[in-house]
């Protein structure tokens, strides 16, 4: 860089042209100089670009129909629940993006978030729906078990530990965590014992509901980075839950009876109409749930008010379970076929065998969650034998294998080779 005059005190910044006397600091490089003001400006530009790249663009937010189509690739059935979730999630992140970009009208109308309550029996896809949504939107996702939570000051997990799981899922990026999704499972287990307020302390029921209120609504929470109360001198992490979407799920066993008592289906006395058990399913009953039913079940009014979107997932029948085995992109049958492919073996299921697996899952009452356990039992012996059998080319699973514990048929390579040659000869003829 050229000097001004003979003195060495008038060096110029190569970017802004200011002299050494006009700035606080001038840093020299090989033939160039940069001042402290230009360094600060460069840092501001870099921070702005990084912040913009980390945000979801307004035009990139998927529409509700696109969200439903994505869910269809991974979750079988549950059309009503998918529609409700898609609309709620779209409105939630649309609100966040509108506030981020300063969309017209946001100054006059403040948009509140709508948390979601999912009702339905175990193994019907509540957790899977929430996980798939988070994966599609590329936002941090955390699952919490409500049964482990207790009121502050008692043995158990604090509600702030839920937020710690979300922060960990975001790799401690607080800004990302503040737009994440938290799924609180088994939320029906924190219902109080009766609909009337109790004079005794309910530390794992109503006390947990009270502790969750501010978090669901939106507050700046202090989260212990090491969890729990074992490290009293640790510095807390602050996270704003205003834009965190909470999805609460539970089986709510017994809620159907409360709804039926309100709607008048069934009844008692000499003039009451006797109703067959199969006439009205739990799924149909859950679709008519009202806030007053949740209150009678044991949720406090403040907690119900912070979960405005209530939807239910339906029980899975035999055909739905068979579809779950084969249709989704990560279907169980495809997963096991891939495992056998790694050993150079083809795995084939007959349709009656898949139906038998679905029947077993329905008998156990475990829903889709029990399918993997049944598949492991069915394939255990063949998964033990095949890796040590170099002649194995194909494994056939029949209905008898599932129901009668018969060993699967292992077809040798020589037989499959002869069959392939025969098929080629028949085609050429």
UniProtKB/Swiss-Prot annotation:
InterPro entries: AAA+_ATPase, ATP-dep_Clp_protease_ClpX, ATPase_AAA_core, Clp_ATPase_C, Clp_protease_ATP-bd_su_ClpX, ClpX_bact, P-loop_NTPase, Znf_CppX_C4
Keyword set, alphabetical order: ATP-binding, Chaperone, Metal-binding, Nucleotide-binding, Zinc
Binding site for Zn(2+): 13, 16, 35, 38
Family annotation (Gene3D superfamilies): 1.10.8.60, ClpX chaperone, C4-type zinc finger domain, P-loop containing nucleotide triphosphate hydrolases
ClpX-type ZB domain: residues covered: 1-54
Annotated Pfam families: AAA_2, ClpB_D2-small, zf-C4_ClpX
Gene Ontology terms: biological process: cell division; proteolysis involved in protein catabolic process
GO molecular function term, any single one: ATP hydrolysis activity
GO CC entries: HslUV protease complex
Record family assignment: Belongs to the ClpX chaperone family.
NCBIfam families: clpX (TIGR00382), PRK05342.1 (NF003745)
Assembly behavior: Component of the ClpX-ClpP complex. Forms a hexameric ring that, in the presence of ATP, binds to fourteen ClpP subunits assembled into a disk-like structure with a central cavity, resembling the structure of eukaryotic proteasomes.
Protein function: ATP-dependent specificity component of the Clp protease. It directs the protease to specific substrates. Can perform chaperone functions in the absence of ClpP.
PANTHER family in UniProt: ATP-DEPENDENT CLP PROTEASE ATP-BINDING SUBUNIT CLPX-LIKE, MITOCHONDRIAL, ATP-DEPENDENT CLP PROTEASE ATP-BINDING SUBUNIT CLPX-LIKE, MITOCHONDRIAL-RELATED
Protein name: ATP-dependent Clp protease ATP-binding subunit ClpX
